Amino acid sequence: MDTGLALAALIGLGSALVLMYAVLRNYTYPKIEEPFFSDPTLFKIFTVGLFEGTLLFVLYTYLWQLFTVVGLGFVVAILFGAIIEFAKLVTLNLKRFSGISDTIFYGFGLGLGLGAAMAFGMIYYWLKGELDVTSTIMVVMLALQYLLLGAANGVVVGEGVARCKPMEFTLQAVLYSEAFHLINIPFYMETDVIWIKYVALIAASALAVFIFYRAIYRRLPKVVDDVLKMNGKTRNDIYGLK
């Protein structure tokens, strides 16, 4: 069995399914009687995210070497960060998703699928080469960063569509994504100063975890409540709402 493929599936797809269960179980059956979203729609849009993430990863395989070019790396990081988030907006910014609280969850599903595909491809792609244990751990860390950031920024873009302010929140997600890619530039550099790669990965991991925590556990419950009230509705079973 291809070890790289197995690890890519475990980290990319396996972690995505675990995250999906951990986050969404408080908003659907059997935890509550009236789910906050449609399960079939969520899985469809998760599949769309997998497709988009695959296309973006193909683009990544052409762009990553440019990260090492002085000056050009910053431009590529900014452009790639923007492309990822606007891809989510193009998918979510439909009339059927505008102004409804469900969209926040669909944004999560879309971003999670996109991040899972990126993580899967990244691990499989990098592990085709001969990497030592330390390098393998670094690649896995990078892949998990994409998974967390994808899901979190999906919620941010979804919030914008739900609040009928898509561009405002998408630009916020773009800033997060661009900051993440800029921080990670040293990871791609060919240098003997290996500690700079560690610092970049740790800083990017901290940023991804912070954005994920803020989006999922701080923002999501409040946004659901706000959008429901915007539509003249209210619920007292929103998980995490104080």
Where in the sequence are the language-model features?
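Hydrophobic alpha-helical segments at protein termini of multi-pass membrane proteins
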Residues: 1-242
